[in-house]
Amino acid sequence: MIVNEFEKLTAGKLLLASATMLESNFKRTVLLMCEHNEEGSLGFILNRPLEFKVREAIHGFNDVDDVLHQGGPVQVNSIHFLHSRGDLIHNSQEVLPGIYWGGNKDEVSYLLNTGVMHPSEIRFYLGYAGWSAGQLFSEFEEGAWYTAEATPDVIFSDAYERMWSRTVRAKGGAYQLIANSPELPGMN
């Protein structure tokens, strides 16, 4: 079932924690991979909202009432963003068609504060998830991860609690059973 999952992983794909992943940073997480090459991998957790708002955490974003998200356990004091406006934000890197990572923060602030860009077109993250060369491959061999296709609907979804099960279930077949498994299998 998990054969060749690692070979399917590229920038722009989703990385899904397997049901056996119990490590607290990644338990039942859905990540968007933004970089994946021989040097390592980098992505952002999509389904871990934090309890404070962007305007409370990032200077210059006074009108952004959306929640900030935990991007991952690496460099947790760094700010990153995913957005759909590569046409307006310079220095953005296209991750998949219509979805961009990063860009000019001052432009983002201006676009949001003037209403040219809507908060639903961007997500902000504290930190990121990162793996050194070979590390993620080893985790795949241990059965820690699955892959899936990314869509803007998943990336900008507010259904955080159901995101993992819905995304795993959408893979079909035996993954539908996995998606319905209890969080702590030994507790049922």
UniProtKB/Swiss-Prot annotation:
Top-rank taxon, per record: Bacteria
Xref: SUPFAM superfamilies: VC0467-like
A family per Pfam: DUF179
GO cellular-component term (any): cytosol
PANTHER family assigned: UNCHARACTERIZED PROTEIN YQGE (PTHR30327), UPF0301 PROTEIN YQGE (PTHR30327:SF1)
Protein family according to the UniProt entry: Belongs to the UPF0301 (AlgH) family.
Name listed for the protein in its UniProt record: UPF0301 protein Cag_1601
Taxonomic lineage from the root: Bacteria, Pseudomonadati, Chlorobiota, Chlorobiia, Chlorobiales
